[in-house]
Amino acid sequence: MDLHTAVYNAAHDGKLPLLQKLLASRGREELEELLGEVAGGGTPLLIAARRGHLDVVEYLVDHCGASVEASGSVHFDGETIEGAPPLWAASAAGHLAVVRSLLHRGASVNRTTCTNSTPLRAACFNGHLDVVRCLVGEHKADLEVANRHGHTCLMISCYKGHREIARYLLERGAQVNRRSAKGNTALHDCAESGSLEILQLLLSCHARMERDGYGMTPLLAASITGHTNIVEYLIQEQPSHEQLSGTELPGEGSSQMAGNHCSTPEDAEQYESCCPTSREAAVEALELLGATYVDKKRDLLGALKHWRRAMELRHQGGGFLPKPEPQQLVLAYDYSREVTTPQELEALITDPDEMRMQALLIRERILGPSHPDTSYYIRYRGAVYADSGNFERCIRLWKYALDMQQNNLEPLSPMTASSFLSFAELFSYVLQDHSAKGNLGMQLDFADLIGVLSKGVREVERALQLPKEPDDSAQFTKAIAIILHLLYLLEKVECTPRQEHLKHQTVYRLLKCAPRGKNGFTPLHMAVDKETTNVGQYHVGVFPSLQVVKVLLDCGADPDSRDFDNNSPLHIAAQNNCPAIMDALIEAGAHMDATNTFKKTAYELLDSKLLAKSTVQPFNYVTLQCLAARALDRNKVPYKGFIPEELEAFIQLH
């Protein structure tokens, strides 16, 4: 073990005598080196603060000159936090003495991590009230510094259910109606976490029932998460605003909560009148809650109970509230339509499958197609059908969800990528199942495969039409890889000449938009790379794939295309030791003696320990022109401007 690691481990374990021994008599430069980051990104001071070793922290700062602001990587609950200062780590872990010590030694109370999380947010997240009081009450920490998502300390306290911290932040003037980047408020966080007491507290402070970026109110947020207590509280009969006009606000004269004009949860019912729940909102909340009971809680009787209440509210005094007429019935939902009468509702009890379709219909109507939960539960229901062997029903639902995602989400959305991968895994399983069972297994339809492949190409086209290149190159690479896996599976399905033509048209669309994955890989590079095999948890296709390579070449893929290291697909095939694929590339016109950035030919990259070299004979493909080009390059003979441009490009190829 080297000295650097030994110092880190001693700080981690709180072994001050050992640490003093290791660092004694060290010069300033050597101390700076030893107190710097280790391989994992942490520092001795950071890990000592994380572990709560006060004596080690003070020794490193006072006697070794460790910076109280030096940030690094630290682990919490299985997650790596990048750019965390020691004060953040101590606050997150709840080590009050270490927090006070670091602040006394000059640590910035509002110093953030790479995600803009403050020490105060870390303490709020983990419920350390004493640390929160220290940071805010003693050192004036800024309550309103939000993380990169616009999520504030009050919001995270509400979401995690830390009532006393939420109360304290409100007392200190936290903005109760602050909105995050996605438009949600602290009320939304309470509704999603099911914390009724904190929700009452927020309402007593005049929190408003706002809609977030998806059009969701806190009431609907409680419905989709299945928190019946929140839903019941918000839809219960409340006194009208006029009834309370002129009523003095309890606690209004209080010095601590005057900024928010709130007092205690017990007074919340008086203030609920500021945001009464309409009959229509209550109906939708109960209907959506019933859908949640079907799909999330798997409680069909509980769902019926909530749907009955919603139906009763629709028919109560004040005028009948009809459901909107559907524009068209959906094949994926088995052409089901929502029930509209109490009799139709009661008939559902004998048809569980129809109840599940009702849940999907209700969710799509209320949340709309752009809300992630809408497509998520359609995919969930499809997966349940697949598990029971009903692959056709699954494919219909998944195709409907995929269309919904592509029409409403940004290109390369993780949810859309997950849908494509699920299709590839399902198709692979169906093909294997049919191979094992013969006529008893489901026959995979060409139309289903080519339809999903075409949508995959469309996703790449959408991403490349953006004003700038895709932010996440890994996600873009994965999208191309999934398309290649779908093509791999399609090669296992018998095609008519017309279907073969349609397949080639789809592949041509992909090649025409010239997508580039990691390190500048073209689809042809990826088709000859074994790393393309790894796209998900389950096995789909195997790469390198000669069949996929041939299809790409037939559709016009350039066998001499280059990646960022000037490797051609032939180089990558050689690195993967695939002589059969190399032969196919050479027959398609790939130059055997073309060199990469490191002046290596594909033949030179073949594994000498294997027999592949004996099957590939480079001199069968090298021309005198190729040898002359390499001689010019090897001897540094100037040629630019003295020969035609076409010949210059040929020499540069070598």
Curated annotation (Swiss-Prot):
Keywords: ANK repeat, Cytoplasm, Mitochondrion, Phosphoprotein, Repeat, TPR repeat, Ubl conjugation pathway. It comes from the Eukaryota. The keyword Membrane does not apply. Residues 253-263 have a biased composition (Polar residues). The keyword Cytoplasm applies. TPR repeats lie at residues 283-317, 375-408. Its main location: mitochondrion. The modification Phosphoserine is found at S108, S608. Pathway: Protein modification; protein ubiquitination. It is found in: Mitochondrion; Cytoplasm. Signal peptide: none annotated. PROSITE patterns: ANK_REP_REGION (PS50297), ANK_REPEAT (PS50088). Residues 241-265 are annotated as: Disordered. One of its GO terms (biological process) is ubiquitin-dependent protein catabolic process via the C-end degron rule pathway. ANK repeats lie at residues 2-31, 40-70, 82-111, 115-145, 149-178, 182-211, 214-243, 519-561, 565-594. InterPro entries: Ankyrin_rpt, Ankyrin_rpt-contain_sf, TPR-like_helical_dom_sf. Belongs to the fem-1 family. Substrate-recognition component of a Cul2-RING (CRL2) E3 ubiquitin-protein ligase complex of the DesCEND (destruction via C-end degrons) pathway, which recognizes a C-degron located at the extreme C terminus of target proteins, leading to their ubiquitination and degradation. The C-degron recognized by the DesCEND pathway is usually a motif of less than ten residues and can be present in full-length proteins, truncated proteins or proteolytically cleaved forms. Component of a CRL2 E3 ubiquitin-protein ligase complex, also named ECS (Elongin BC-CUL2/5-SOCS-box protein) complex, composed of CUL2, Elongin BC (ELOB and ELOC), RBX1 and substrate-specific adapter FEM1A. This is Protein fem-1 homolog A-like. It comes from Mus musculus (Mouse). The lineage of its organism: Eukaryota, Metazoa, Chordata, Craniata, Vertebrata.
